[in-house]
Amino acid sequence: MIISEVKTDKERKDFIEISSKIYQKETNWIRPLDKDINAVFDKKLNKAFRKGEVVRWILMDKGNVIGRIAAFYSKKAKPEKNNLKVGGCGFFECINNQEAANLLFDTSKEWLKEKGYDSMDGPINFGERDKWWGCLAQGFEIEPNYLQNYGRDYYP
């Protein structure tokens, strides 16, 4: 497995399209518009970049994208009561493979550690709190709201 930071147009496309592969048989999943996902990572459109940073990765195995994740922090976030500096992760998608999932989360954790953060919260979104927060753990038979994280039954 090879994890790569998303930098090229192809990698940006792979980052978006992996969710379609993960949920291809899920009738209730609502695919977000590419522009809605891209807006989160666009410095011109997302005000969170003024006080924070985000990085995203895709995970490849044998030439196929098998997962993705993003990590981020905001300098305006106040330390928790226990004085921990908390960064975030989100946009996690992965095939049913624990080793792959661990690599994605560990990569996010290490990046945040390098930036001086002690802890990681997620799944959350870099920026506004009105979309892509939380993890669906049950209720897969119910159609979700648009811009709500979906999930697989093996995620929790």
Residue ranges and their predicted role:
Residues 1-44:
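Short amphipathic alpha-helix that is part of the acyltransferase structural core
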Residues 13, 17-24, 60, 106, ...:
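A broad, structural surface signal
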Residues 33-37, 77-82:
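An N-terminal domain-start capping segment
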